[in-house]
Amino acid sequence: MSLISIVCLIPFGLIGAVNPIITLSAYAVLGGMYLLVVPLFLFYWMNNRWNVMGKLERLFIYGLVFLFFPGMILFAPFLNLRMNGKEGS
C-alpha cells in the first residue's frame, strides 16, 4: 500500500511528503510564520502607517489581523503601540 501511495505522489513532486522529518519541518516553518513572523510584520506595518492608511489598505490589514489573531495575541502584552502625545505643550 505504501508503494502505491509513493508512486501516486511522484508525478506531483511530493515524494518528500512521506519523510516525517520534512513533514515536521514544514509544520514548524509554517507555524513559525503564522505565530511569529507575520504578526510582527503586521504590528510594524500598523505602527508606521496608522495615520496615512487608505480605506482599502486598512480593510486589508484588519482582515490580516483577524486571520493572524493568535500570533497577535502572543505579542500584544509586550508591544506598546499607543500614539505619542503632543510634545512641548
UniProtKB/Swiss-Prot annotation:
It is a multi-pass membrane protein. Keywords: Membrane, NAD, NADP, Plastoquinone, Quinone, Thylakoid, Translocase, Transmembrane, Transmembrane helix, Transport. NDH-1 can be composed of about 15 different subunits; different subcomplexes with different compositions have been identified which probably have different functions. The lineage of its organism: Bacteria, Bacillati, Cyanobacteriota, Cyanophyceae, Synechococcales. It is an enzyme of class 7 (translocase). NDH-1 shuttles electrons from an unknown electron donor, via FMN and iron-sulfur (Fe-S) centers, to quinones in the respiratory and/or the photosynthetic chain. The immediate electron acceptor for the enzyme in this species is believed to be plastoquinone. Couples the redox reaction to proton translocation, and thus conserves the redox energy in a proton gradient. Cyanobacterial NDH-1 also plays a role in inorganic carbon-concentration. It is found in: Cellular thylakoid membrane. The keyword Transcription does not apply. It comes from the Bacteria. One of its GO terms (cellular component) is plasma membrane-derived thylakoid membrane. Pfam families: NdhL. Belongs to the complex I NdhL subunit family. This is NAD(P)H-quinone oxidoreductase subunit L. GO terms for molecular function: oxidoreductase activity, acting on NAD(P)H, quinone or similar compound as acceptor; quinone binding. The chain crosses the membrane at residues 29-46, 59-79. It comes from Prochlorococcus marinus (strain NATL2A). It catalyses: a plastoquinone + NADH + (n+1) H(+)(in) = a plastoquinol + NAD(+) + n H(+)(out); a plastoquinone + NADPH + (n+1) H(+)(in) = a plastoquinol + NADP(+) + n H(+)(out). Its EC number is 7.1.1.-. The keyword Thylakoid applies.
